[in-house]
Amino acid sequence: MKKILAIVLTLALSLSLTSAFAGEPLTIIATENPHAEVLELVKDDLAALGYDLEITVVSDYVVENPATSAGDVMANFFQHLPYLAGYNAEVSEEEQLVPVVYTHFEPMAIYSGTKTSLDDIADGDAIAVPNDPVNENRALLLLQAAGLITLPEGTTLESTCTPADIVDNPYNLTIQELNAELIPGARADVAYAVINGNNATLVDLVPYVDGLYAETADSEAAEAYVNVIVVKPENAEAEWVKALEQVIYTQKVYDLIVDSGFAPTFEVPAAETAAE
């Protein structure tokens, strides 16, 4: 009986240490707005649950998935589902990552460069677009939706179109492919710029305020490009992941996302809504 009790106590202690990751902090790497801001907002709530959150903020988001795969951090928060799928398709099975907390949609939009209205578009104008496969295809679909180009019939969000695939370019637009994080700073060199949500917020651009043409909150893109917190598969059911869900799916996080100009993709629990 004593032996059984000892085993039970040992297991309980082990589970306790696992839950709190042996006293180590919960490390998450994130881009600034709204990702790191969301994490900062819930930091005290996590502390109340016994988790010491450490946030590393970066502007170059391409480092976040490799850092998570390598175990340098426990999670990351910056990307949408197609970007994650693209990463997983390029890495080994040991480096795969999975989404665990679904948060919001960040519209991609066409912003002004040297021109302030799409009505002013002229033959030969240059438009900057992201050069990574997922966001480039998305940007080209946005240009098509705005009536500026035509892509092959059947092109979807899952396609990987590049400027070479454009079948009709009535304005003879020059599509300049740049690293996504460099596009906001290149606006003075192009007529228009297609900027994703992360990078737009870094220069205080709000899609539905400053954008000349943006993806809508009820579009296919809104469902497909939901932003997620990502972890290694073995951590998907961890207690700290459940804690993240608990503190993020709240009214104050919902409001922060809305105030940032984005669209939350979760519902606030009825119990919290009723309490207010």
Task: Outline where the language-model segments fall.
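A bilobed periplasmic-binding-protein/Venus flytrap-type ligand-binding module shared by bacterial periplasmic
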Residues: E106-L118, A224-A238
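Pocket-flanking alpha-helical
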Residues: Y61-E93, T201-D204
